[in-house]
From Swiss-Prot:
This is BUD13 homolog. Residues 345-356, 429-438 have a biased composition (Basic residues). GO terms for biological process: mRNA splicing, via spliceosome. Residues 448-537 form a coiled coil. There is a cross-link at residue 65 (Glycyl lysine isopeptide (Lys-Gly) (interchain with G-Cter in SUMO2)). GO terms for cellular component: nucleus; U2-type precatalytic spliceosome; U2-type spliceosomal complex. It comes from Rattus norvegicus (Rat). The modification Phosphoserine is found at residues 135, 148, 161, 174, 182, 186, 212, 225, 234, 237, 258-259, 263, 271, 283-284, 296, 340, 343, 370, 372, 375, 409, 425. The modification Phosphotyrosine is found at residue 511. Its main location: nucleus.
Length: 636
């Protein structure tokens, strides 16, 4: 089949634009029939059902809306509008007051006026759990403006911003305590409902101005009011957790003396320390220094304190000292009113001291102001304040503690009341009077010349005694003692050892003779004697040799007619001698050990023939060896 001719671009474009009619009119494809496409099942034909599971997240919706709004705003014409140049706080307050989303308890009176008893410049805290607010806390950044509607707010503060849960580890230059008369630029936290409230009585905080009697105040604020109970150290740390209701661990504290974003922190519920940590220095600025707690922002250690056990001495101190009127809610909140910190001491900020080293309180007790003490205040019943710059208030009934600069040690026992500026050394024992006299660096005593001479004489005498003692025992003989402690005589021991060795050698020789055999030893000795005797004779033996003739005569020969005569003569000779009887019968068969039979043997062999077989085997073996030797040497 021939290939179709190629089409030009113009022709192809013409057919494409004209649709199917152009294809039918001309070209080789015009005669072909096109197949109808079948509609796919489940398509747009209306048959079946399609389920689309597409969950759109809130983040995507919010971003899409923002983008669309921006695009629409770009298309709209530019129109002059009213610009509200008021501060952000005022705008938020207006929006908060005009909003109906929030129901305030005790914040507004019936006439609609907002009771702002406490302008709080402090950063937000977490609300106590005894407040009737069930809204959840939000975790936000304190540096970004919050456009969301206000959340849980203090009932006595004009801040409509939402509460935040704050972090414990970012340094914060903003004030962290509640000021009494400075506007609040920082976002609010969950707060205590301690403003005038028609609701039932609650545990109130001691840092809000209320009609109760005055409490301790800060020692560096020119405050003519009666004393209030405050912390005497600029606390840069978040409130600690008590065993009961607060267990917040704050690894870092921010410095809260400069304006800026508020310090992130998470104040725990019912924290008694939060009530006393949040007080400002003066009443004019929005951000002022707090008096530092005896801890630095970075060296804070985790601590857990028992509010119940730690606050009872505080209430006792207030009632006994009588320097300030008692708080009406003292009986109810005595366990929350004072921060008796049992945590390890920390460095104190030198923020609120302003160079004051020593100051006298109303009773004239002088106490050193420790500029960089890191330890928390200890309970002390003595009056005396460490750091009061311009304190015009009456004397406070505040526990005095022993301040120690750069003190990182664990809390001391409360019996110690003396303050030491920078004494980190262990306690010294005072020299006992009358026991030791002072000495100079050379070691000599101080005093009269006669005493010095007497000392020299004593030293010389001691040296002489030591020399004499050394000379006395220089050439002495060493004394050896046994285990019982008695002296040992080495010479006598050597003699005893020698005698014992000789006796042992004799016994060994006797056992050696017995082991070799006495008969063999006697026979060997006899052979030696005979050999010596023969050596003394001439070289050749003759017939006239008496010894040779006797030996030949005593021999017994088989078949000798004179054998019986010889035996009888020997028997007669040996009759008078006491000799054991011996077998004298015919020659017995040989055995392995050459044992002679007893004198009563009758000559009958009653053995099993083992001895005879043994000797026959030995004889045959020897014969074979001789035959082999002869065969090996026969051709030589």
């Amino acid at each position: 089949m021939a290939a179709a001719p190629p089409l030009s671009k113009a022709e192809y474009l013409k057919r494409y634009l004209s649709g199917t009619d152009a294809g039918l009119e001309g070209g080789p494809e015009s005669g072909r029939k096109r197949r109808k496409k079948r509609p796919k099942p489940g398509g747009a034909g209306g048959k079946g059902m399609r389920i689309v599971d597409d969950d759109v997240g809130w983040a995507a919706i919010s971003t899409d809306k923002l983008e669309k709004e921006e695009e629409e705003d770009g298309d709209l014409p530019v129109v002059a509008e009213f610009v509200d140049e008021r501060p952000e706080e005022v705008k938020q307050m207006e929006a908060f007051r005009s909003s109906t989303k929030w129901k305030l308890l005790g914040g507004y009176s019936e006439d609609g006026h907002f009771h702002n008893d406490d302008q709080d410049p402090s950063p937000p805290r977490k609300a106590r759990h005894d407040t009737p607010d069930a809204s959840p806390p939000r975790r936000v950044r304190h540096g970004t403006p919050e456009p969301s509607p206000p959340r849980r707010v203090r009932h006595d503060t004009p801040d409509p911003s939402p509460p935040r849960r704050v972090r414990h580890d970012s340094p914060d230059p903003s004030p962290t305590r509640r000021g009494h008369d400075s506007p609040d630029p920082s976002p609010t936290r969950r707060v205590h409902h301690d403003s005038p409230d028609p609701s039932p009585p609650r545990r109130v905080r001691h840092d809000t101005p209320d009609p109760s009697p005055p409490r301790r105040v800060r020692h560096d604020t020119p405050d003519p009011s009666p004393p209030r109970r405050v912390r005497h150290d600029s606390d840069a740390s978040p409130p600690r957790r008590s065993h009961r209701n607060s267990s917040a661990v704050s690894p870092k504290r921010g410095h809260h003396g400069s304006s800026g974003t508020s310090s992130p922190r998470q104040a725990h519920n019912h924290s008694p320390a939060a009530a006393q940590h949040r007080r400002t220095l003066d009443s004019s600025g929005a951000q002022h220094h707090r008096r530092a707690r005896h801890d630095s922002p970075d060296l804070e250690l985790p601590k857990a304190k028992s509010s119940k056990a730690a606050e009872r001495p505080s209430s006792k101190t207030v009632s006994q000292s009588g320097l300030g009127p008692p708080h009406p809610s003292l009986s109810m909140n005595s366990k929350y009113e004072h921060d008796s910190d049992l945590s390890p001491p920390r460095k104190r900020q030198a923020k609120a001291h302003f160079g004051a080293k020593k100051q006298l309180d109303s009773k004239g007790v002088c106490q050193k102001a420790s500029d960089s003490d890191l330890s928390p205040p200890r309970k002390n019943s003595k009056s005396g304040h460490q750091d009061s710059d311009s304190d015009l208030s009456p004397p406070r009934n505040r526990p005095r503690r022993q301040s120690s600069d750069s003190d990182l040690s664990p809390p001391r026992r409360r019996q110690r009341t003396k303050s030491s500026d920078s004494d980190l050394s262990p306690s010294r024992r005072s020299p006992r009077s009358g026991k030791k006299t002072p000495h100079m660096y050379s070691g000599a005593k101080t005093g009269l010349v006669a005493d010095v001479q007497r000392e020299h004489q004593e030293l010389k005498k001691q040296d002489q005694d030591a020399t004499d003692l050394g000379a006395q025992f220089e050439f002495t003989e060493t004394v050896f003692r046994d285990k019982s402690g008695r002296k040992r005589n080495l010479k006598l021991e050597r003699l005893e050892q020698r005698r014992k060795a000789e006796k042992d050698s004799e016994r060994d020789e006797l056992y050696a003779q017995w082991g070799k055999g006495l008969a063999q030893s006697r026979q060997q000795q006899q052979n030696v004697e005979d050999a010596m005797k023969e050596m003394q004779k001439p070289l050749a033996r003759y017939i006239d040799d008496e010894d040779l003739d006797r030996m030949l005569r005593e021999q017994e020969r088989e078949g000798d007619p004179m054998a019986n005569f010889i035996k009888k003569n020997k028997a007669k000779e040996n009759k008078n001698k006491k000799v054991r009887p011996r077998y004298n019968g015919p020659a017995p068969p040989p055995n392995r050990f050459n044992i002679w039979p007893g004198y009563r043997w009758d000559g009958v062999d009653r053995s099993n023939g083992f001895e005879q077989k043994r000797f026959a085997r030995l004889a045959s073996k020897k014969a074979v060896e001789e035959l082999a030797y002869k065969w090996s040497v026969e051709d030589m």
